């Protein structure tokens, strides 16, 4: 029996079909220097032969508490087969459709190849070759040979051994870490960058240690926590706090009365029929604008409404109906009356949901429009009065869905008054049930859940609310955190690293041969205007607008906080944006307790947030080289994103200047073309990399992040020139430690589509681009870590 064989990379001149077994717990070791066998010339066909003795029958895979799955057994066996030996390759591909890959091990032999094919046998937990297992091998991608093996996969390091820094720098530097076990299941991953976050523990201490931590901001958080968990008082209040809002809405008998109700935040804390969000116009970031989104209190999200069938939508709305019915019947309505109100509310809500969706006009937005122009476009709906009630009487508005406001305006008539009233009352009820008494809060809980279990749930939820930067107490929480935990010395040191990075990059820009004088001037203008926001602003935002009156009910406290936040944010509409201003009140994603360090093009600001900092990424005890390798690498990486094809769309003031006709923004076209020519080399390099067996990396997808990694090291090498005695070994080893991680095979293979290269490539493929690395470790052409100068891929 002869079978046709096709390969993606190179033709198979000679193959020998081999039989053998490998075991997850066998005790035999592969010979690292396999002797070559005589070549059996079968051209491009695969034939059955007797097993060859140089391919071991079993491969030993360490066994521990972690249970390897079939795919991992195949992968780790392939690692053993090819090891760090040249001319050995392996691949995995599911040929028979059983969702378990077959393992192909190929060895160069003379002018041809010898190949062993193993299949997994679940009865033995072994990979066993059957002679007729291979029917068609299409587009196989072979790993191994001169490429590094992905040693982040659990078990790979132990099998490969420590190859030395000249052969696999990532594996060698991190060998002890990688050879240990840090994950417990096949869905796990362990990354010290992700494990660094101490923020939650710090915030818990801040809340709970009342004698140690005191002040205005922390008191706001504790007042909210105490009232939220005072169940005696909440039970005594019952649903009385919400009844005044329901009764007020029930007495609306005309559109003119509805106008007044909607404009008064004291009477109407919930329903405006749109959600105002403070933001910036990407084409003119000089002032804050207001974005009008769809109503945030809808019973179902627009994307679900537009992509689900009627039964699914009905099921999703069940919770809304249960909660609304519970509150409204306790307020004195009958179930029949509530059912009618819900039905009427859906008439209005469905019409608005239909309009809350992109159309051709939203694909080509007109940009921000002056407030008075938008208000004038409404013939019926009192948009101007509602906005004035929120403190908005100047500036510009951005409409997300072009059809939404016209539909709302068209429906706002006396004829539909009952629908509007029903919508308001049912939505008030639904938005309130969690902030009243125990009976209301449990209305959506299972019948067997005890009161104590629900109270514990509320306690946990309250902690989440008061410890989150995006919650209604976010500003007070961030102020308290920065007051107690941001170290001024750390801020000073990290600011110095940012300044060193910017200074070095400026020097590189001036020296770049591919940049024209015009391009250099534009790049330097943007870099010089870039503001670095490190750990905390010099002045905290006043949180007085969040002050709590503890004599109020918990419900009233929640309602007042909700309105105070809304009015505080909306009041910024039309205000000039101050370059470098750190508005964590308006943009919670830049709150310092967020786990991030990144460049924001619309603000032309670089943020190093405290949530990203830990003893692993930064401490004052680190040598400067280690600081530069860890936080410096990240800062340099992110900074250069401001000058990549996405970053060049935004000018020095954060305005988007790129157009369809001029996608290169502020960069001269010739410079952009030169940049992309260099980028194509980066892309081509990663196209050749086989990250995991049978799945090659995508250079087109990963070149941007890879280029930023390389640029970060380029900047560090520039900085090193000004530091006599710079310890390059410390720098490169520290950078390898930064990216060390451990993955299950299935978890790692899932990252093949990520825009970032695998972590072992972020070390090996990046370090190998630099003369300083070659010289530090005495690399030559015989070492895997050596890349000839003419093949190196740097942009900056």
Language-model region placement:
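Noncatalytic, helix-rich "gating/capping" subdomain that lines the substrate-entry/channel surface
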Residues: 201-501, 537
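Acidic, divalent-cation-chelating loop motifs in proteins
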Residues: 90-98
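Intrinsically disordered, low-complexity linker/terminal regions across diverse proteins
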Residues: 474, 479-796
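Sec-dependent signal peptide cleavage junction
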Residues: 19-39, 43
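Structural motif
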Residues: 111-117
């Amino acid at each position: 029996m002869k079978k046709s064989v096709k390969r993606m990379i190179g033709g198979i001149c000679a193959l020998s079909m081999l039989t053998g077994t490998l075991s997850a717990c066998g005790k035999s070791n592969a010979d690292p220097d396999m002797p070559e066998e005589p070549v059996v010339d079968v051209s491009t066909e695969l034939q059955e032969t007797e097993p060859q003795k140089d391919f071991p029958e079993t491969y030993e895979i360490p066994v521990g508490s972690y249970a390897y799955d079939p795919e991992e057994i195949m992968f780790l066996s392939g690692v053993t087969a090819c090891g760090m030996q040249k001319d050995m390759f392996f691949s995995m591909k599911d040929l028979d459709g059983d969702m378990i890959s077959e393992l192909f091990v190929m060895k160069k032999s003379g002018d041809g190849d010898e190949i062993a094919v193993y299949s997994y046998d679940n009865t033995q937990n072994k990979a066993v070759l059957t002679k007729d297992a291979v029917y068609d091998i299409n587009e196989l991608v072979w790993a191994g040979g001169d490429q590094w093996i992905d040693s982040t996969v659990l078990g790979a390091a132990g099998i490969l051994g420590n190859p030395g820094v000249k052969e696999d720098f990532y594996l060698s530097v991190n060998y002890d870490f990688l050879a240990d076990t840090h994950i417990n299941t096949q869905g796990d991953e362990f990354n010290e960058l992700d494990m660094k976050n101490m923020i939650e523990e710090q915030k818990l201490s801040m809340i709970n240690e009342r004698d140690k931590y005191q002040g205005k901001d922390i008191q706001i958080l504790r007042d909210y926590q105490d009232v939220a968990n005072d169940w005696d008082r909440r039970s005594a209040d019952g649903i009385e706090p919400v009844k005044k809002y329901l009764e007020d809405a029930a007495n609306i008998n005309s559109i003119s009365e509805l106008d007044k109700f909607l404009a008064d935040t004291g009477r109407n804390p919930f329903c405006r029929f749109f959600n105002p969000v403070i933001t910036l116009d990407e084409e003119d970031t000089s002032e804050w604008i207001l974005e009008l989104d769809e109503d945030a209190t809808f019973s179902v999200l627009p994307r679900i409404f537009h992509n689900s069938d009627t039964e699914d939508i009905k099921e999703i709305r069940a919770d809304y109906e249960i909660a609304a019915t519970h509150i409204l019947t306790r307020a004195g309505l009958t179930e029949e009356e509530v059912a009618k109100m819900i039905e009427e509310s859906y008439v209005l809500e469905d019409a608005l949901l239909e309009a809350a969706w992109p159309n051709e006009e939203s694909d080509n937005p007109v940009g921000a429009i002056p407030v008075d122009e938008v208000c004038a476009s409404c013939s019926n709906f009192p948009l101007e009065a509602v906005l004035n009630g929120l403190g908005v009487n100047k500036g510009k508005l951005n409409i997300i869905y072009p059809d939404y406001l016209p539909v709302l305006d068209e429906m706002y008539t006396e004829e539909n008054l009952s629908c509007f009233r029903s919508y308001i009352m049912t939505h008030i009820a639904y938005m309130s049930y969690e902030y009243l008494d125990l009976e209301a809060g449990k209305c959506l809980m299972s019948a067997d859940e005890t009161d104590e279990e629900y109270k514990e749930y509320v306690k946990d939820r309250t902690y989440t609310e008061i410890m989150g930067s995006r919650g209604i107490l976010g500003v007070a929480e961030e102020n308290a955190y920065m007051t107690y935990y941001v170290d001024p010395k750390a801020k000073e040191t990290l600011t110095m690293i940012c300044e060193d990075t910017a200074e070095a990059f400026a020097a590189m820009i001036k020296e770049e041969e591919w940049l024209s004088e015009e391009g250099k001037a534009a790049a330097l203008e943007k870099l010089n205007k870039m503001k670095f926001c490190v750990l905390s602003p010099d002045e905290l935002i006043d949180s007085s607008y969040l002050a709590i009156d503890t004599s109020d009910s918990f419900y009233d406290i929640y309602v007042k906080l909700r309105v105070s936040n809304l009015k505080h944010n909306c009041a910024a509409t039309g205000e000039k944006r101050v370059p470098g201003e750190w508005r964590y009140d308006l943009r919670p994603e830049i709150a310092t307790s967020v786990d991030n360090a990144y460049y924001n093009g619309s603000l032309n600001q670089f943020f190093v947030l405290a949530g990203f900092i830990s003893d692993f990424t930064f401490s004052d005890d680190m040598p400067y080289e280690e600081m530069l390798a860890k936080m410096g690498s990240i800062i340099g990486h992110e900074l250069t994103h401001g000058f990549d094809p996405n970053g060049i769309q935004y000018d020095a003031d954060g305005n988007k200047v790129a157009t369809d006709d001029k996608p290169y923004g502020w960069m001269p076209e010739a410079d952009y073309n030169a940049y992309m020519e260099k980028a194509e080399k980066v892309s081509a390099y990663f196209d050749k990399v086989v990250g995991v067996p049978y799945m090659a990396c995508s250079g087109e997808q990963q070149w941007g992040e890879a280029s930023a990694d390389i640029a970060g090291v380029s900047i560090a090498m520039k900085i090193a020139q000004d530091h006599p005695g710079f310890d390059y070994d410390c720098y490169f080893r520290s950078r390898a430690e930064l990216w060390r991680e451990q993955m299950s095979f299935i978890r790692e293979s899932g990252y093949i589509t990520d825009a970032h290269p695998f972590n072992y490539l972020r070390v090996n493929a990046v370090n190998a681009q630099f003369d300083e690395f070659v010289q530090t470790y005495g690399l030559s052409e015989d070492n895997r870590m050596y890349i000839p100068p003419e093949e190196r891929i740097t942009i900056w």
